[in-house]
Regions:
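Short glycine/serine/threonine-rich phosphate/pyrophosphate-binding segments
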Residues: 29, 53-69, 82-86, 159-170, ...
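Alpha-helix C-terminal capping segments
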Residues: 36-43, 59-72, 90-91, 170-177, ...
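Active-site-proximal loop->helix
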Residues: 49-53, 58-117, 193-211
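Active-site/ligand-binding loops adjacent to catalytic centers
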Residues: 109, 113, 119-121, 175-248
């Protein structure tokens, strides 16, 4: 979708809408891919219990797929994650284990590992290190972008949560368009990708507080740090100027887009 607010600048600023996925986000793609990959490998069986740390949207996707396929799912989340996301997961039948806010995603990951150890027939998708995460975006997200932009784009700008999205899409697009500039977006308060220290921040969905295993930094041309104020500002502008309700991480990406445009 081309954003109207940039048209007068002779710059085509396009946003890929993922809200039409069944669970309302891009994470539905990796939830299905990771579960079906494990099924094909015989790792996931009908009596398996899915346990996964999540900041929200992957949990929604896993709960949705688990409901359809008949799996029990336990999601481990920092207590700071939105109540709205938790309610949606509960509707799909998910169970919860909440971890202290100050421990961030690392705390949720550690707790999930503990639960896997003590729970019979437990399986964890491991979204931060599962190659099926990257594969899902190579096979679907990247191909859809190529269909819409057969002649390529100049910039790919997106936030980094698990690293699967930016890695999967960038690996495909850069092979076709070597001059593509790939920009990773992270919270100013927790600039781990830039070499900074992890810290709590309100931009849910990005900035896990560590560098994910599947994140390929060699594909990244630049990293932009976005403040919480700018993330909220552009999230609000997306609603008031484009009539699109996006998340705070989307606002962070749009703030990074604005920074890039200022340099052109």
């Amino acid at each position: 979708l081309s954003l109207r607010r940039q048209r007068q600048m002779c710059i085509r600023d396009s946003l890929k809408l993922e809200r039409t996925n069944p669970g309302g986000s891009i994470k539905d793609r990796i939830a299905l891919a990771m579960i079906e990959d494990a099924e094909k490998k015989g790792i996931l069986t009908p009596d398996s219990i899915i346990i996964e740390p999540t900041s929200g949207n992957t949990g929604i996707g896993l709960a949705l797929v688990a409901a359809v396929k008949g799996y029990r799912v336990i999601l481990v989340m920092p207590e700071s994650m939105s109540v709205e996301r938790r309610k949606l997961m509960q509707i799909y039948g998910a169970e919860f284990d909440l971890t202290p806010r100050e421990k961030g995603m690392k705390g949720a990951i550690e707790r999930a590992a503990e639960l896997v150890e003590i729970t019979p027939n437990a399986w964890t998708p491991g979204q931060f290190n599962n190659p099926a995460n990257v594969w899902a975006h190579q096979q679907t997200t990247a191909k859809e972008i190529l269909e819409d932009f057969p002649n390529g784009v100049d910039y790919l700008i997106t936030g980094v949560g698990t690293g699967g999205h930016i890695t999967g899409v960038a690996s495909v697009l850069k092979e076709r368009f070597p001059k593509l500039q790939v920009i990773a977006v992270e919270p100013e308060l927790s600039p781990v990708l830039s070499g900074g220290s992890p810290a709590p921040h309100p931009i849910q969905g990005i900035g896990a507080g560590f560098v994910p295993e599947i994140y390929q930094g060699n594909l990244i041309d630049n990293i932009i740090k976005v403040s919480k104020d700018d993330a909220f500002k552009y999230t609000k502008e997306l609603a008031t100027k484009e009539a699109i309700l996006g998340g705070i991480s989307t606002g962070a990406s749009l703030a990074a887009v604005a920074q890039i445009i200022d340099t052109l």
